[in-house]
Design a protein with these regions (language model features):
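Short, Lys/Arg-enriched N-terminal segments with co-localized hydrophobic residues
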Residues: 3-23
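Bacterial N-terminal signal peptides that target proteins for export
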Residues: 26-43
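N-terminal maturation segment of proteins
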Residues: 57-625
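Intrinsic low-complexity/disordered segments
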Residues: 1, 25, 30-31, 146
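Generic detector of N-terminal low-structure segments
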Residues: 13-16, 37, 48
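N-terminal hydrophobic alpha-helix used for membrane targeting or insertion
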Residues: 26-27, 45, 443, 449
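C-terminal motif of bacterial Sec signal peptides marking the signal peptidase cleavage site
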Residues: 51-54
Length: 625
């Protein structure tokens, strides 16, 4: 996850925190991509994300299908196929498997290796799995599939065809982004590894013993990238090294995350004798000291040795085929038939729209600018905030049953390197365990309300629980395009400003529009650096037009864009995609438009590419008329 700039900056004569609250939901290495490219590695399962410049509206999207004819019942052959595919993919590594399911056999998974996964260094460019799956999917007669299965088919085909088209770009793959990288995520994954029975503990210990081998394999792949000049810039390598060293300082301590969290979880497992507990504690300490710590140290050594090997610098477009890889990132996460140039124009027009909205509000009431600095949600308790959000969203979002969740805090050793907040989705057969992590150093108490709207209600936790209740094909939990998942969470986060109890609706709208504008500035910079070749100075010149007059802000933004290309776009372009869908529905339904019903349409569809959302919107609009 990207570490967002945390400075106060003037925008439109208004002070605003420029930090975008990003969650870990689907900040994940794509399991399908890793598995099918024979570069299998740990899936980061955070199951725990009308234009004013004259641009045409995207109503005429690429059609996913030519017919809406569907069967009244599920096609059992198709169900069997996609369930087997789900089982094959999850069997690739144990952490992914355990994160998604508590009882693998109930999902047809009877054979799996207890491993964190490995890159296949001998065949990194093998794309045969893509072609095989595409061929099988196309062999199904679409008219024999139920409506739900047709969505699964469309989503799978779109994903596989996109991966096949760009499968030659494997050299860009890395798991060592400064704040979304596996070196940061792994301790959190281990902390959230559920212990329900002794088998879970045994497998957990075995996974700890695989950390050094896992990083050794990763080092070999990074060496391959370095030999071709694709290794990260020294500035980024230094950041990763620093975060690894920070983890190493406390990893083996009694009160460190790897020891204390394990001991806490151990105490909650039924049926363990005092001797069992003592033995497991000793095994954990041994595994951490003999495998986890040496593994992280070897990662530091590898990064240090490869510094200076990078032949290129700056955004992706400065690398051979880098612009094409950026196109792949947007296509993969959004699935929206737009070119990067069109996305860039969409961001520009959205900035204009939000700024005009703020100007209009200020013209109606000039005192609103003076009141802006006093804006507050007046709530700081996480549980109280989530309770309040659950109550306030009922007019705009369909209700779901009560959800059990736990509020947790990122360990001190990881605070400087992880995102402001994150949501871990529950196992599919254990939906009552939901965890929301808060980074105390990345999120102030005054920012918790929109942060928890993003992570909880009506963001990730709400959307995850709603989707699970629709009984989707299991494979869709893995697919879950980031543009939908993070776009939804960002979209509702902006809406949450309307729930602030300021007694001034105009002020709430002003703050929401201001925040949305800042998000768009980040997406603009992401595109600028990675597709148009902006330098750090270009970033500064651009943001200085909006009052960002501190060059250190531009510096941090620039390296955030370089470290994790497309990550901001996933949030912001996804958010704008939902805004465009809403605008189309409002335009065609006029006074018959109902916001709650619109949100239900989005939620009923579940995480899919935006082309699929647009393609199915007309049928929903027809029902609403």
């Amino acid at each position: 996850m990207i570490q967002y700039v945390n400075n106060k900056s003037i925008f439109l004569i208004i002070l605003i925190k420029t930090e975008m609250r990003i969650s870990m939901r689907n900040k994940q290495l794509c399991l399908l991509h890793q598995f099918l490219n024979k570069a299998v590695s740990l899936l980061i399962v955070f199951i725990m994300v009308i234009t004013l410049s004259g641009c045409s509206l995207p109503w005429n999207q690429k059609q996913i299908s030519e017919t809406t004819i569907s069967a009244t019942e599920d096609n059992t052959d198709f169900t069997d196929y996609v369930n087997n595919l789900f089982a094959d993919l999850l069997s690739a590594d144990m952490v992914s498997l355990h994160a998604y399911v508590e009882h693998p056999r109930d999902f047809g998974i009877n054979d799996y290796e207890i491993t964190l996964g490995r890159y296949d260094l001998d065949n990194p460019d093998d794309s045969s799995d893509y072609t095989d799956i595409i061929s099988t999917l196309k062999s199904f007669d679409r008219s024999t599939l139920s409506a739900k299965q047709q969505i699964t088919l469309d989503e799978l085909l779109m994903y596989m065809e996109n991966e096949l088209e760009y499968s030659d770009l494997y050299m860009f793959n890395t798991q060592l982004q400064t704040t979304t990288g596996i070196h940061v995520q792994l301790p959190l994954l281990f902390a959230e590894y559920p212990f329900e029975e002794k088998k879970d503990i045994d497998e957990y210990i075995e996974l700890l013993c695989d950390v050094d081998g896992y990083f050794e394999n990763m080092a070999a792949f990074e060496k391959l990238r370095a030999d071709n000049g694709y290794f990260m810039e020294d500035t980024l390598a230094d950041e990763v090294i620093e975060s690894c060293n920070s983890f190493l300082e406390t990893a083996g301590l009694e009160d460190g995350a790897m020891i204390s969290t394990f001991n806490e979880k151990l105490a909650s497992v039924d049926g363990l004798s005092s001797q069992d507990i003592a033995d497991y504690k000793a095994k954990n300490v041994s595994a951490v000291n003999e495998h986890v710590i040496p593994g992280y140290q070897s990662l530091v050594n590898m990064l240090t040795s490869l510094k200076g090997s990078n032949r290129y610098s700056g955004g992706l477009c400065n690398y051979p085929d880098g612009s094409r890889y950026f196109e792949y990132i947007l296509s993969s996460t959004l699935g929206w038939s737009k070119s990067v140039d069109e996305y860039d124009k969409l961001v520009d027009s959205s900035i204009k729209k939000y700024m005009l909205k703020m100007q209009s509000l200020a013209l109606k009431d000039s005192s609103i600018l003076d009141k802006f600095d006093t804006f507050s949600f007046n709530m700081t308790d996480p549980v109280g905030i989530l309770t309040d959000l659950k109550k306030r969203i009922t007019d705009d979002f369909p209700e779901i049953p009560d959800v059990n969740y736990n509020i947790k805090y990122v360990s001190k050793a990881l605070e400087d390197y992880t995102s402001p907040a994150m949501y871990f989705i529950p196992q599919l057969d254990n939906l009552d365990i939901n965890s929301i992590y808060i980074n105390s150093s990345g999120t102030s108490a005054s920012e918790l309300y929109p942060t928890l709207a993003h992570e909880g209600y009506p963001g990730h936790m709400y959307q995850t629980q709603y989707f699970a209740a629709t009984n989707p094909d299991w494979i869709r939990y893995i697919l879950a395009p980031g543009g939908y998942v993070e776009g939804w969470a960002s979209y509702v986060e902006v809406l949450s400003y309307n729930y602030a109890q300021t007694g001034n609706d105009a002020l709430n709208k002003m703050y929401a529009a201001n925040y949305a504008t800042v998000l768009c500035l980040y997406a603009k910079g992401d595109i600028g650096v990675n597709y148009y070749g902006w330098s750090e100075d270009d970033v500064y010149k651009y943001i200085s037009q909006y009052g960002f007059d501190d060059k250190s802000v531009a510096h941090e933004m620039y390296y955030a864009f370089v470290s994790d290309p497309g990550n901001y776009c996933k949030y912001v372009l996804g958010m704008l995609g939902f805004e465009q869908l809403k605008t189309k529905a409002q335009s065609e339904l006029s006074d018959k438009f109902n916001l709650k019903n619109f949100h239900q349409y989005i939620l009923d569809m579940g995480p899919v590419q935006f082309d699929i959302l647009f393609n199915n919107l007309d049928a929903w609009i027809k029902k609403e008329k």
